[in-house]
Amino acid sequence: ELGAPANFTPVADVNINPQNPVINNRSFGEDPVRVSDKVIAYASGLESGRVLSVCKHFPGHGDTDVDSHKALPVLPFTRERLDSVELYPFKEAIRAGLSGMMVGHLQVPVIEPLSGLPSSLSRNVVYGLLTEELAFRGLIFTAALAMKGVSGNADLCLQALKAGNDMVLAPRNLKAEVPAVIGAVERGEFSREELDRKCRKVLTYKYALGLSRKPNIQLSGLGTRINTPQTRDLIRRLNLAAITVLNNKEHILPLHADKEMPPMALLEVGDAGETDALAGRLGKYTSLVRFRLRKGMTEAQERVLRDSLS
């Protein structure tokens, strides 16, 4: 109904690095098996509604402390480690027959020995590992080519297609990239047959998703049709199931609006504004006093904060 035939989700990265600046809560967790189960469930739900799922960021962006939007992360692991952690959810997604895969901008020396070459441009990674070894036959996308983890390379679209990707995402200069691909075909550097094969593959998926027919997009009233009472109840139950209570002294939780509550302190760490939604919700149950632990506080300021909370 919305006219979105593909969704660049789910994130299949195993988030085992607490310093990861970009994956963190986008991941389903730190256990490869549990991540795999949720990836397959989420993607299967998308595809049951004729939306192409795209698992990302192959071969795994979970254990990095660099954001590939800003630089090129390195996965310095052995192949055995990659197989048991990073690659595990992707292999399970392939086994489940899911349709799309996005290759991230990552340096993986054990698979691609050329220093500085991102996995998204590496034929060893895209064709050798994903297509040949893991036998993935679905659509292969690059991560956005405007990202700093890859953007320093020349002729990005051509390199990405030659590496084995079927579709390139968000190139910065499409007007220059298209002639580069055409020129490579004319010079025999990139085969016309390979380009045609990619085009037929993309068209096959478009046909399967019903894109050969005129879409019947009805935006009017869409919010009401999507946000049904059943949907809201499902969201509530998912939220409840996702909560882990570490400490519940004197059984203060759950909070009750009809029960008299003592004043509550909310200790916030980091930038202002990030807990405004939580503070607003807590304020409906009791009077709330907010405290903030800021970076660079003096010992005297920290002492005042401790005294206020004690």
Tell me the role of every PLM-derived stretch:
Residues 1-6:
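Catalytic domains of carbohydrate-active enzymes, especially glycoside hydrolases
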Residues 23-24, 111-112, 222-223:
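Flexible glycine/proline-enriched surface loops and loop-helix/loop-strand junctions
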Residues 21-29:
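Short acidic, glycine/Ser/Thr-rich loop/turn "cap" segments at secondary-structure junctions
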Residues 13, 143-146, 266:
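Conserved acidic functional residues
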Residues 12-22:
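Short, conserved phosphate-binding/catalytic loop or strand-edge motifs used
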